[in-house]
């Protein structure tokens, strides 16, 4: 019965009853809408640091007093002050008696920074609204308990789905200690990623390629196979206007350690390069790669064990991997049940050719029941190309879907 309004001039939230009837009624309905409104603002500002906080989550915080936003903050980088601390410093004495909206439960442990829950409790904040509890076992409800024990009113679960989506990378990594894996492919309308001669630059247009570089900017690692390195000598860097992009860690699947010492990924110094080799790789080649500055991870005897590699990367706090490999690499990841999300770019071109490469090569799945299904599909037009993003519906590896149940 009472509509919630927000006055952008005064930065104040009021009910429609107050505006139109000359009196104020704060019903539970109005409070719920108010909580959602300010939580959306916290979620929005959390994305200011997208791609910069790994392996930490993105977190936004908003402090509200008398229906007005008096302070806000967001976590900028791992090892630096958390969102709540930035907001509290901005609020100063205005924090006393105010409400804090935060996208993730305040931390309760001493790490590279102190516990936020304790700082919030000592600030005089009267009420804390969190979008979701932190699945990190170091926290796991402890932050909210600190606040409750200090007499702070707490509420959890406001826009929880949006908060989980915001931190899908962190939630996968903190629960499984394996990175969130995103597979990207660009193809023609007839499903070709290159011509029969191997030409692939450029199938998609400038807008789609710009989108790919924005994706590189937000994920921690980028992965290709040795075939891509030998054929294209890519830099695997992020190229955005003004040079604002962050370069991901380069990861090369190279079972025999064949990466040339002259390859850009070893000589340009743009980012760390990890070579995933096998026990059968010549030790002299491995030592030369190490001497050239590469990190060499040995996983598997004849072929790179992708599941083992993901665990190794997770242990190195690489919380997300952007796979830009060819058809064989893509199929290997899909068959292993390691892919969480897919970005596909479809160009209005017809290439044809029985020998032209496709996005998913290998032996393929023999039965339709084994096919990888997608869900939560979104599409957009980028220039003349179609961009499709989706999540893998059925995780094919036991335990791989733990993060889907946060």
Task: For each feature predicted by the language model, list its residue ranges.
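Zn2+-dependent cytidine deaminase-like catalytic core
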Residues: 63-162, 249, 269, 274, ...
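Enzymes that bind and transform nitrogen-containing heteroaromatic metabolites
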Residues: 32-40, 44-56, 112, 180-181, ...
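Acidic, Ala/Val/Gly-enriched low-complexity intrinsically disordered segments
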Residues: 14-19, 29-30, 400-402
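A broad detector of short, well-ordered amphipathic alpha-helices
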Residues: 40, 44-47, 71, 82-85, ...
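Flexible, acidic/Gly-rich N-terminal and inter-domain linker regions that tether
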Residues: 25-80
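Proteins enriched for Cys/Gly/acidic motifs involved in redox and nucleic-acid/cofactor modification
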Residues: 52-55, 144, 158-186
């Amino acid at each position: 019965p009472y509509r919630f309004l927000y006055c952008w001039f005064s930065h104040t939230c009021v009910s429609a009853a107050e505006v139109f009837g000359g009196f104020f009624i704060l019903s539970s309905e109005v409070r719920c809408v108010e909580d959602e409104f300010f939580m959306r603002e916290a979620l929005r500002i959390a994305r200011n640091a997208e791609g910069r906080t790994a392996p930490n989550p993105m977190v936004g915080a908003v402090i509200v007093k008398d229906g007005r936003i008096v302070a806000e903050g967001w976590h900028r980088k791992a090892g630096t002050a958390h969102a709540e601390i930035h907001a509290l410093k901005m609020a100063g004495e205005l924090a006393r008696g105010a409400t804090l909206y935060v996208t993730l439960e305040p931390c309760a442990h001493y790490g590279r920074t102190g516990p936020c829950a304790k700082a919030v409790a000592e600030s005089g904040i009267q009420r804390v609204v969190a979008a979701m509890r932190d699945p990190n076992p170091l926290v796991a409800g402890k932050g909210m308990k600190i606040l409750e024990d200090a007499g702070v009113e707490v509420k959890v679960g406001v826009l929880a789905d949006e908060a989980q989506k915001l931190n899908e990378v962190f939630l996968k990594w903190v629960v499984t200690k394996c990175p969130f894996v995103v597979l990207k492919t660009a193809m023609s309308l007839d499903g070709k990623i290159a011509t029969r001669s191997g030409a692939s630059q450029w199938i998609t247009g400038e807008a789609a390629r710009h989108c790919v570089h924005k994706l590189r900017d937000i994920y921690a690692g980028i992965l290709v196979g040795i075939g891509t390195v030998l054929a294209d000598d890519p830099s695997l860097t992020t190229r955005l206007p003004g040079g604002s992009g962050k370069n991901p860690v380069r990861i090369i699947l190279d079972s025999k350690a064949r990466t040339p010492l002259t390859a850009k990924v070893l000589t340009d110094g743009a980012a760390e390069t990890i070579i995933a080799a096998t026990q059968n790789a010549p030790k002299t080649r491995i030592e030369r790669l190490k001497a050239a500055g590469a990190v060499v991870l040995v996983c598997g005897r004849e072929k790179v064990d992708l599941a083992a590699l993901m665990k190794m990367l997770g242990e190195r706090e690489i919380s997300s991997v952007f796979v830009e490999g060819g058809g064989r690499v893509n199929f290997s990841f899909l068959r292993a049940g390691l892919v969480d999300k897919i970005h596909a770019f479809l160009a209005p071109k017809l290439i044809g050719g029985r020998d032209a490469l496709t996005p998913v090569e290998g032996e393929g799945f023999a039965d339709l029941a084994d096919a990888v299904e997608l869900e939560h599909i979104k599409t957009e037009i980028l220039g003349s190309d179609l961009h499709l993003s989706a999540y893998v519906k059925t995780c094919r590896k036991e335990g791989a879907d733990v993060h889907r149940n946060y």
